């Protein structure tokens, strides 16, 4: 939970530095989604705000690794997992948003959206399939089922062109 708070705090602090108001914070199966008035931001600034969450997790890990304490291992592990998961190129995760922003900045909004949707759908199907494979191989791990189903739902939304925080 602390890793998630630090992650969202990273987004929040950068948005505040850019003078952007945060409208809401919603928690869902894939994590939390912060809604802000980012329409005023340029692609590079929004990219910085998007990557600030994973960056905060990495900074937190670096700070904790200064002390050689085994009691911090779970916190470091949770922060690394959250960072890596959020960098997957699946909308609405930070990685999917970053992919959209980079391609939109270089090639325009339509190309950015198309690239982010197709890449995100492929990655979401691979993630969901991989998680179901792990569940089948281990004969359990049912705690992975909600994440796998959410990944398949994200792929369906991306392929069917439903609105996903763009």
Give the role of each language-model region.
Residues 1-166:
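Hydrophobic transmembrane alpha-helices and their immediate loop junctions
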